[in-house]
Structures are given as structure tokens and as C-alpha cells.
């Protein structure tokens, strides 16, 4: 009986994502389908996207700082824009530099722009 109590306690401590993963594993193992009532499926479906890690980021140039020329050069190198377009983008901050970038790419762009003197954020 102690083993069953431990299993119940362990299941009670699972997060929503862990419980969903357990459900999928049991469905595969036993070859069954866990059909949930509509109300429960709606609640679980609404909560799941909030727990997912964001995979795409928009890199936003907030301010060019004191070294505007260096920031313009870096923006040109990162975006392939011409001098006038890059200058307009930098002077019009806050503006997006890159939209839909992966986490690694966004971090790389942010570090390059900050090294040039800009203030950058993700959205």
C-alpha cells in the first residue's frame, strides 16, 4: 500500500507538461487513447502554449548611444542595408533590426550591436 501512496504523491507533484508527456508515453506503451472531456481539453490547451519556451525573437534597437557611426556600420553589416537606410533605421530607434531570429542568432546580433555602443532588447 505504501508503494501506491508514493505513486499518487509523485503524480500529484508533476507539472502540466510532465503530466502530458506521461500521458503520451502511457498511450504509446499500452496502445490506448486518453480521450479527455472538452472542458478539460480547453483548459489544458490554453495553458500549454504559455509554458513553451519562445523560439523566435525580434531584435529591437532601442538606442544608438554615443557611438552612432559604429552602430550604423554594424547595422549595415548585419542587415545588408545601404548607408542611408541604415542611418535612417538607427536614427529612428526604437526599430526592429531582425525579426523572427533564433535565440542564438538574436544573442549574437545583440552582442555585436552592444559592442558598437547600442542598446538592444528582445521581443
Swiss-Prot record:
Q: Name one GO molecular function term.
A: structural constituent of ribosome
Q: How does it assemble?
A: Homodimer. Part of the ribosomal stalk of the 50S ribosomal subunit. Forms a multimeric L10(L12)X complex, where L10 forms an elongated spine to which 2 to 4 L12 dimers bind in a sequential fashion. Binds GTP-bound translation factors.
| Record carries keyword Membrane | no
What organism, scientifically named, is this protein from?
A: Bartonella quintana (strain Toulouse) (Rochalimaea quintana)
| Xref: NCBIfam families | L12
Q: Which domain of life is it from?
A: Bacteria
**A cellular-component GO term for this protein:** cytosolic large ribosomal subunit
Q: What is this protein called?
A: Large ribosomal subunit protein bL12
Give the CDD domains listed for this entry.
Ribosomal_L7_L12 (cd00387)
Q: Keywords of this protein's UniProt record, alphabetized?
A: Ribonucleoprotein, Ribosomal protein
Protein function: Forms part of the ribosomal stalk which helps the ribosome interact with GTP-bound translation factors. Is thus essential for accurate translation.
Q: Which InterPro entries match?
A: Ribosomal_bL12 (IPR000206), Ribosomal_bL12_C (IPR013823), Ribosomal_bL12_C/ClpS-like (IPR014719), Ribosomal_bL12_oligo (IPR008932), Ribosomal_bL12_oligo_N_sf (IPR036235)
The family this protein is said to belong to: Belongs to the bacterial ribosomal protein bL12 family.
Question: Which GO BP terms, alphabetically?
Answer: translation
Per the UniProt record, the lineage of the source organism begins with: Bacteria, Pseudomonadati, Pseudomonadota, Alphaproteobacteria, Hyphomicrobiales
